[in-house]
Amino acid sequence: RVQFGKTLAEFQATQFKLADMAVRIEASRLLAYRAAAALGKGRATREAAMAKLFASESANKVVYDALQIHGGNGYVREFPVERYFRDARVTEIYEGTSEAQRMVISRELLK
């Protein structure tokens, strides 16, 4: 998209958004790998809950930011971000809500 004669990628705010999105995606991936490694050792309750909580909330934040960058096109079915926006929301609900994951994490920390 072009705004005020510049592409959105030229704006510092967009660059910061993209950087934050990349950090969230990478951190989510690393938490998932850590949970998988813990599962291999027979102890993954806390790690899995942390990965699920962070990744699902990050998915929603990243998709929301992507939607903002795309503007009106983010709501058009021809662009994948519209589908991601709908799909990301359910990640905080299935296999345990964010609140349930927080309960699991705190229970494990207090052991």
Q: Residue spans of the language-model regions?
A:
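Alpha-helical interface subdomain recognition
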Residues: 1-111
